[in-house]
Amino acid sequence: MKVRPSVKPICEKCKVIRRRGKVMVICENPKHKQKQG
């Protein structure tokens, strides 16, 4: 899980979602998981 100021999809499988007001990227590749912090 990467915590960064701007989250962007890295590959075509990445999905940008909102969870409890936080923007997150979820993906099949665990290295692509991101959270806005």
UniProtKB/Swiss-Prot annotation:
Q: Protein name, please?
A: Large ribosomal subunit protein bL36
Task: Family membership, please give it.
Answer: Belongs to the bacterial ribosomal protein bL36 family.
UniProt entry tagged with the keyword Electron transport? no
Q: Which gene encodes it?
A: rpmJ
- What does the record list as GO biological process? translation
Keywords on this record?
A: Ribonucleoprotein, Ribosomal protein
HAMAP family membership: Ribosomal_bL36
> Cellular component terms, GO, for this chain's entry?
cytoplasm; ribonucleoprotein complex; ribosome
Per its UniProt record, what PROSITE patterns does this chain match?
RIBOSOMAL_L36
Superkingdom = Bacteria
Entry GO MF terms = structural constituent of ribosome
